[in-house]
A protein has these predicted regions:
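Basic, alpha-helical terminal appendages of large translation-related enzymes
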Residues: 1-7, 123-128, 132, 155, ...
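Structured secondary-structure scaffolds
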Residues: 2-50, 97, 102-106, 156-387, ...
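A charged helix-plus-loop insertion that forms the helical arch/lid used to bind
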Residues: 62-75, 147
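A glycine-rich helix N-cap at a beta->alpha junction
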Residues: 73-93
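Feature captures the FAD/FMN-dependent oxidoreductase FAD-binding
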Residues: 99-120, 129
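Cys/His-rich short segments
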Residues: 117-180, 184
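Long, amphipathic alpha-helical stalk/connector segments used for oligomerization, subunit docking
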Residues: 350-353, 357-361, 366, 381-430
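Generic structural concept
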Residues: 371, 375, 408, 412, ...
Length: 533
């Protein structure tokens, strides 16, 4: 492993395999992928982890419904996730499954560490359990059924509003209650541990309300990782699932190589999660790590839900198959293409809040930003360069001060402004910085009128200057849009004969104005973003 570069470790949640991947799972994964690609371009040695959460009662029920064993069911689902991630250009470095031997080993090692820590005890659980969310609830947390949710008198999950099961079983408990003050201190000393900031307020309020010890083993079913010192118990699914982040970087493996990898990679810089699992990642997970003396992740970024407008009520509703309002990823790909898909969800939907989506808005954003602005700039500029300079780029100007150069002025400091936004996952803000250059370049064409300059031999130097600047703006914009749209950005560089630059890990250096060699062949090609009718 090359440890000469700084490590950057980013994760998605590992996804339940009770159903096929959907827009929500794709959303989390693309958020992480964009950050991973950006960090690679900025010189980091990136570890990007995703995977599948394959244990628990919910998975066992889904398998039984399909007439399979749980292992057969999870094996049948893994290709669906991998195929979608490949289609969406996800660049994960590892894909972990909790049924893998490495996860079994790590979880059993965790049990031994927890036993030694003194934060584990055996007791009996008597309370409510939500199978779909794999979550325990106390009597005071339970929602009573009403006319809107469930039936009157039913005990419902306060999060998903589905009926709860009453569970009574012997269990091992993790002393989560012992970590209330430690967690509040963590939030005080590291206010950016939970992002966005308003999510931190939610987490803090929950912890301040008091913590109950957590049941971390089950005896009423057997689809899980066995507790090493008690054969009748299997691991509670979240106690298992959360550990995947450390399993993937060598936790519990007794070799020099694994210990070196863990020391280099851990802690993670970002866990990307949905807001519905924030308590597991910002309360239970750090408490578990504190109990066994391990470092905490630097940031947990919780994004909102994707919502659609209910035509009857006019209200925004979370997408779900049960509501019948879910949109399949393939439907969006068919409309926008993969790169348009990535661009829309990463720049028009604010990651920290719930995002209302619609096909009308997708078309509007695609046409305005990609077809009319970015794609149009590429087509017009390459066409003029090929037409006026025999299929090549003009020579590099001897001086960038010979004529007015508004694009170079915008490019000055652009990378720094862009990186400041990307560092905090503000992809929409980063896009705005790049689009300022793209819009300016389109205006530059209209203001400088290259077609008029081409008719006057005395204006040959100015024409070359204008076209060079347009091509250089395209080159820099392509690098900055690469994390969002890797294929079309690489294609734009190829058409400039700059394809070797696509693998650069020096973003600041490669985006220095004036690096375009000049004189190289250029290719107009077909439109990268055909306008949607």
């Amino acid at each position: 492993m090359d440890q000469s570069k700084p490590s950057f470790f980013i994760t998605t949640p590992i996804y339940y395999v009770n159903a096929d991947p959907h827009l929500g799972t794709a959303y989390s994964t693309i958020i992480a992928d964009v950050q991973a690609r950006y960090r690679r371009s900025a010189g980091y040695n990136v570890m990007f982890l995703t995977g599948m959460d394959e244990h628990g009662e919910k998975v066992a029920e889904a398998a039984a419904k399909h007439g399979m064993t749980p292992q057969e069911w999870t094996d049948s689902q893994a290709p669906h996730f991998k195929e979608l991630w490949s289609k969406l250009e996800i660049s994960n470095d590892d894909f972990i499954r909790t049924t893998e031997p490495r996860q079994h080993h790590a979880v059993q090692y965790l049990w031994e560490r927890m036993k030694e820590s003194g934060y584990l005890y055996k007791g009996s659980y008597d309370g409510w359990y939500c199978v779909p969310d794999e979550t325990y609830f106390t009597d005071t947390q339970v929602q009573k059924g009403d006319e809107e949710y469930g039936s009157v008198g039913q005990h419902l999950c306060p999060d998903c509003h589905r009926p709860l099961e009453r569970v009574q079983e012997e269990s091992y408990f993790f002393k989560l209650s012992a970590f209330q003050d430690k967690l509040l201190k963590l939030y005080d000393e590291h206010p950016d541990f939970v992002e966005p900031a308003f999510r931190m307020n939610e987490v803090r309020s929950f912890v301040e309300g008091g913590l109950n010890d957590l049941s971390v083993s089950r005896t009423s079913f057997d689809w899980g990782i066995q507790v090493p010192f008690d054969e009748g118990h299997v691991t509670y699914v979240w106690f298992d699932a959360l550990l995947n982040y450390m399993t993937a970087v060598g936790y519990g493996v007794d070799t020099d190589e694994a210990r070196a990898e863990l020391a280099y990679r851990w802690p993670a810089q970002f866990h990307i999660v949905g807001k519905d699992i924030i308590r597991f990642h910002c309360v239970i997970w750090p408490a578990m790590l504190m109990a066994i003396g391990e470092a905490l992740p630097e940031h947990v970024f919780a994004h909102g839900f994707l919502t659609v407008r209910n035509a009857e009520t006019g209200k925004a509703e979370k997408m779900s198959k049960s509501r019948g309002n879910a949109i399949a990823p393939q439907d969006v790909i068919d409309m926008l293409g993969v790169e348009g898909y990535r661009y829309y969800f990463m720049t028009d939907v604010v990651p920290g809040t719930d995002g209302a989506i619609s096909f009308d808005r997708m078309e509007q954003v695609y046409n305005a930003d990609l077809a009319n602005s970015w794609g149009n700039l590429i087509s017009r500029s390459l066409n003029m360069s090929g037409k006026y300079f025999d299929g090549c780029a003009p020579a590099k100007p001897a001086s960038f001060d010979a004529f007015d150069n508004p694009l170079a002025k915008i490019a000055d400091g652009l990378v720094e402004r862009y990186m400041a936004k990307m560092d905090v996952l503000d992809y929409g803000g980063a896009k705005d910085e790049v689009m300022e250059l793209i819009h300016a370049a389109n205006h530059y064409i209209e203001d400088s009128e290259p077609w008029a300059l081409a008719k006057d031999e005395a204006k040959a130097d100015e024409l070359a200057f204008v076209i060079y600047n347009l091509l250089e703006a395209i080159r820099i914009a392509a690098h900055l849009l690469m994390p969002l749209m890797p294929q079309t950005s690489a294609e734009a560089l190829r058409r400039l004969s700059c394809e070797d630059e696509a693998a650069s890990d020096d973003l600041k250096g490669i985006c220095t104005w004036g690096l375009l060699a000049g004189g190289q062949p250029v290719e107009k090609g077909d439109p990268l973003f055909p306008r949607l009718a």
